[in-house]
């Protein structure tokens, strides 16, 4: 059986359209930086009051798989 280890990081996405779009914005950006994203958890949803409108804000914890220990050992660092 393959053993896996995951790490979670907190990010915040915003949108002037909807909570769903704020989530999509956050996940899209995380995919540009983090490899092997596996899942996310919505930690908090809130709204900002802007002059003339609303800002939807969503705090997410996104989880990604850490590289295998063998690969980390050969490179000297854990990615």
Predicted regions and their residues:
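A cross-kingdom feature marking charged/low-complexity
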Residues: 41, 45-79
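Short, well-ordered alpha-helical segments
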Residues: 2-40
């Amino acid at each position: 059986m393959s053993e896996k280890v995951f790490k979670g990081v907190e990010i915040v996405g915003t949108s002037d359209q909807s909570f769903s779009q704020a989530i999509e914005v956050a996940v899209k950006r995380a995919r540009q930086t983090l490899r092997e994203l596996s899942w996310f958890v919505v930690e908090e949803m809130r709204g900002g009051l802007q002059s003339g409108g609303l800002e939807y804000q969503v705090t997410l914890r996104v989880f990604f798989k850490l590289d295998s220990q063998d690969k980390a050992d050969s490179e000297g660092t854990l990615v």
